[in-house]
């Protein structure tokens, strides 16, 4: 339940960041006027945006959920016998780590672009950068798929042990 709540929080924080990110009007690669962007002819300025804090919060939530989920599942690997589902669990865990890595990269870059970009310094190479539409939404989707993979691995890991316990109970009652 804890993992699910943190994953859900990361998803909604990413969606909120998508709607709060810095924006500018762009036509034919020329900035006409910006809601947030200020241009002095040779350098630009972007104030810090709420998407920065939302992105950091989403990053913390998805990281905590990933780490706690993997600790719970990996602890279960050492306590139980190896079964057929172990391979499937490992595949789900690897899938969750790949999704986690991509989600963390997108959230980190998106959040850092929404931090203050000062005149003459910018975000990278003295230029201001804006997060493209859909970056935070995609990272939210990846956060959800990461949590789904973790919960799936957990469900497949718990299910065989429950079946063994139920089988043992039925066997002792019949004797």
Swiss-Prot record:
Keyword Transmembrane among record annotations: yes
Cytoplasmic side: 25-52, 108-135
Transmembrane segments: 53-73, 87-107, 136-156
Span of the signal peptide: 1-24
Cited function: Together with MWL2, contributes to secondary cell wall biology, specifically lignin biosynthesis.
Keywords: Cell membrane, Lignin biosynthesis, Membrane, Signal, Transmembrane, Transmembrane helix
Name this protein carries in UniProt: Protein MODIFYING WALL LIGNIN-1
Localization terms from the record: Cell membrane
Disulfide bonds: none
Family named by the database record: Belongs to the DESIGUAL family.
GO biological process: lignin biosynthetic process; lignin metabolic process
Subunit structure: Interacts with CRK19.
Main location: membrane
Parts of the chain on the Extracellular side: 74-86, 157-175
Domain of life of the native organism: Eukaryota
Protein topology in the membrane: Multi-pass membrane protein
Gene Ontology cellular component annotations, sorted alphabetically: membrane; plasma membrane
Gene that encodes it: MWL1
InterPro entries tied to this protein: DEAL/Modifying_wall_lignin1/2, DESIGUAL
Loss of function: phenotype: No visible phenotype. Double mutants lacking both MWL1 and MWL2 exhibit smaller rosettes with a decrease in rosette fresh weight and stem height associated with a reduction in total lignin content and an increase in syringyl/guaiacyl (S/G) monomer ratio.
